[in-house]
Amino acid sequence: MAKTYQCDPLIDAFLDDLWSSKGLSDNTLSAYRTDLRHFDRYLQSQGLRLRDVGQADVRAYLAYRVEQQFARTSSARLLSSLRRFYNYLLQTKQISGDPMAQIESPKLSRHLPDSLSESQVDRLLAEPNVDDPVECRDKAMLELLYATGLRVSELVGLTMEQMSLRQGLVRIIGKGGKERLVPMGEMAITEVEHYLTSARHELLGHIQSDVVFPSKRSQMMTRQTFWHRIKLYASRAGIETELSPHTLRHAFATHLLNHGADLRVVQLLLGHSDLSTTQIYTHVARARLQELHQQHHPRG
């Protein structure tokens, strides 16, 4: 009979520390939990515990992941989780040496985020029927997402007190508890105002909620539900580009850079703590400029 997996208590202690000291989002904490539990399961199958691990054990686990054909990006994220976890154990004096000290991350090719052209965005945003309460909500969400570059988790969790239509701003508490103010833009303000006055009350019914964009059940919408809504409108618009929940966030950043926005301004709007995270969008913008040059320059 297979032995039931018992999660090492060190994992929960680490996650509790992250939650209380760093203010990380539930999604980030969930990713850490998934990574650490996978490593812990492997160790237990080898008769090892998390606190007894050496560099050879980590390397053996990485070799196992290669054999199991895990993606390099997945292993890179896992190594980041392990580094933070073992640094916590070191700082709290639960281990005497860091098994991650000489472990290198796999080299990754810089993946350009999937994005949409400006004409594709126009087609996508034109699809929702604003006479229908659900699609009126979706129209406002799409316009706001493209205007602000919010993460989908930030959009679906948006509350009324975070938004000032008079000032045209949304106040976001992003990763690590960092606050940022993001301009909404006139078109997004118009669509959100229309939604608030004509459709939101129909979705809420008699339920009181501070959530700006409730689901049909008057609850906070999930990221997965909104992703499915995006794919629905993309299909109706005849857009065949592979979409992700962050497609409009990527389009927001790329289109700003295409129109001459300063990289550090885009960094602030996106809520990136590291400029290098934002810089990948310059590659997207540059690729688009090269494409336009080849299409339209007489010697392209």
UniProtKB/Swiss-Prot annotation:
It holds the Pfam family Phage_integrase. One of its GO terms (molecular function) is DNA binding. Belongs to the 'phage' integrase family. XerD subfamily. Site-specific tyrosine recombinase, which acts by catalyzing the cutting and rejoining of the recombining DNA molecules. The XerC-XerD complex is essential to convert dimers of the bacterial chromosome into monomers to permit their segregation at cell division. It also contributes to the segregational stability of plasmids. The lineage of its organism: Bacteria, Pseudomonadati, Pseudomonadota, Gammaproteobacteria, Alteromonadales. Keywords: Cell cycle, Cell division, Chromosome partition, Cytoplasm, DNA integration, DNA recombination, DNA-binding. Gene3D superfamilies: 1.10.150.130, Intergrase catalytic core (1.10.443.10). SUPFAM superfamilies: DNA breaking-rejoining enzymes. NCBIfam families: PRK00283.1 (NF001399), recomb_XerA_Arch (NF040815), recomb_XerD (TIGR02225). Its main location: cytoplasm. Residues 5-90 form the Core-binding (CB) domain. It comes from Shewanella oneidensis (strain ATCC 700550 / JCM 31522 / CIP 106686 / LMG 19005 / NCIMB 14063 / MR-1). This is Tyrosine recombinase XerD. The active site is at 151, 175, 246, 249, 272, 281 (o-(3'-phospho-dna)-tyrosine intermediate). It is found in: Cytoplasm.
